[in-house]
From Swiss-Prot:
This is Protein phosphatase 1 regulatory subunit SDS22 homolog. SMART domains: LRR_SD22, LRR_TYP, LRRcap. Keywords: Leucine-rich repeat, Nucleus, Repeat. The keyword Coiled coil does not apply. SUPFAM superfamilies: L domain-like. It comes from Caenorhabditis elegans. Regulatory subunit of protein phosphatase 1. The keyword Repeat applies. It is found in: Nucleus.
Length: 326
């Protein structure tokens, strides 16, 4: 059993008080409180600055160490070959290391750290979910071995291009929002994809998605889109988010016969006649259309006019409305 049984007292300066020497506890966990047969060890928010020796827990499958002070992944983790889930969310990690022996890992969360490069994952061939949100990653790379991946989350990084993921043919959900991507590309072979989320990038054209026959949700808000052309082949799409763009026409949306949700608020559509195209979508339930020019033209009648035109809709913007007219 590990010797990590009691908290360690260290002296850290308090903010705005350089003279303070009040002790602050680190590693505030006691492994003796866990059953040796426990499949799950949760050391979240314990001010841990290292991963303790957990060899005394032979059946451990899940390790959670969120919101701690880890600056590196301790070599001690290499012995935890039974792990299927590792969560090191919100620490101070700068690189991915010492994970090679964790060959049974199915889920890995390294979000909210300071990681600059994706690497060290070659042996994790069973991995199905990988979270790398809010790091300092500039390039998608070194994912060649992760062919079983079903969910990849790379939001809030510094990525400029969608690349090196074409082999991830089992991918179901892809999140790369809030990056620096200028072109929608590199996803053509991901035919199992059901969710593609790219909000907050610099995309100006919807393209290279015509092969994504299983796509159900497409998120493209906060870009530079001027129209919606390119979505027409996505006939199984249930949700389309193009809010806060430069869109002037809804032409093309009427082809999305399965659409339930259409989010297009904060765009540049001037004519209310554009709304009439949406009346063809019999399954449409929710629309977000406010703060387009046609909204400001007649704010008092806006909601009523939408209700009269889109009789099938049950929610307009953030407010529900009466049941659709039969």
């Amino acid at each position: 059993m590990s010797n990590d049984k009691s908290a360690e007292v260290v002296v850290l300066p308090r903010e705005n008080d350089e003279e303070s020497k009040e002790p602050v506890l680190k590693n505030q966990f006691d492994l003796s409180t866990f059953d040796i047969d426990s499949p799950e060890i949760d050391l979240t928010h314990t001010r841990a600055d290292h991963i303790p020796d957990l060899t005394g827990f032979p059946k451990i499958e899940e390790l959670r160490m969120r919101n701690n002070l880890l600056v590196s992944i301790s070599p001690t983790i290499s012995s935890l070959v039974t792990l299927t889930s590792l969560d090191l969310y919100e620490n101070q990690l700068t690189e991915i290391s010492h994970l090679e022996s964790l060959v049974n890992l199915v889920s890995l969360d390294l979000s909210y750290n300071r990681i600059r490069q994706i690497n060290g994952l070659d042996k994790l061939t069973k991995l199905e979910t990988l979270y790398l949100v809010s790091n300092k990653i500039e390039k998608i790379e070194n994912l060649e071995a992760l062919t079983q991946l079903k969910l990849l989350e790379l939001g809030d990084n510094r990525i400029k291009k969608i690349e090196n993921i074409g082999h991830l043919v089992n991918l179901d959900e892809l999140f790369i929002g809030k990056n620096k991507i200028r072109q929608l590309e590199g996803v053509e072979t991901l035919q199992k994809l059901s969710v593609l989320s790219l909000p907050g990038n610099r995309i100006v054209k919807i393209e290279n998605v015509e092969q994504l026959n299983n796509l159900k949700e497409l998120y493209l808000s906060d870009q530079g889109l001027q129209d919606i052309h390119g979505v027409e082949p996505l006939t199984n799409l249930l949700l389309l988010d193009v809010a806060n763009n430069e869109i002037k026409t809804f032409s093309g949306v009427e082809r999305l016969e399965s659409l339930n949700d259409f989010w297009a608020n904060d765009n540049k559509v001037e004519s209310f006649s554009e709304i009439e195209q949406l009346s063809k979508l019999k399954g449409l339930q929710t629309v977000y259309l406010e703060r387009n020019p046609f909204y400001f033209n007649d704010t008092n009648q806006y909601r009523r006019k939408v209700m009269m035109t889109l009789t099938q809709v049950t929610q307009i913007d953030a407010t529900t409305c009466r049941k659709p007219i039969e």
